[in-house]
């Protein structure tokens, strides 16, 4: 198992690629919340932990938190992010 860090910015529709979005706009989520993301990860049956008091490096003034998720070694970060977006729609 490996750990993936998931910042809400990675799947946020309002962000550009330069601002940190990693998924295509077609599947990105409008204003994703940490609690909503964690809920979907839990439903997927994956082990995770939430870090609430952390700020996204590109926006160090804003505390948004992130989620650490344990996934299979064969799962890429982008593949996992796309799966989360599809599950949240």
Curated annotation (Swiss-Prot):
KW Zinc (keyword) present: no
Location (main, coarse): cytoplasm
Localization of this protein: Cytoplasm
Pfam families assigned to the protein according to its UniProt record, in alphabetical order: SRP19
Keywords in alphabetical order: Cytoplasm, Ribonucleoprotein, RNA-binding, Signal recognition particle
Keyword Plastid: no
GO molecular function terms noted in the UniProt entry: 7S RNA binding
A single GO BP: SRP-dependent cotranslational protein targeting to membrane, signal sequence recognition
UniProt GO cellular component terms: signal recognition particle
Family as reported in the entry's similarity comment: Belongs to the SRP19 family.
Role: Involved in targeting and insertion of nascent membrane proteins into the cytoplasmic membrane. Binds directly to 7S RNA and mediates binding of the 54 kDa subunit of the SRP.
Quaternary state and interactors: Part of the signal recognition particle protein translocation system, which is composed of SRP and FtsY. Archaeal SRP consists of a 7S RNA molecule of 300 nucleotides and two protein subunits: SRP54 and SRP19.
Name under which the protein is recorded: Signal recognition particle 19 kDa protein
Gene: srp19
């Amino acid at each position: 198992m490996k750990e993936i860090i998931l910042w809400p910015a990675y799947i946020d529709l309002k962000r550009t690629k330069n601002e940190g979005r990693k998924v295509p706009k077609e599947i990105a989520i409008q204003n994703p919340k940490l609690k909503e993301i964690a809920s979907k990860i839990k439903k997927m049956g994956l082990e995770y932990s939430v870090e609430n008091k952390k700020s996204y490096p590109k926006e160090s003034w804003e505390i948004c938190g992130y989620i650490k998720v344990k996934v299979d070694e064969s799962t890429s970060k982008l593949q996992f992010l796309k799966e989360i977006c599809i599950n949240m729609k």
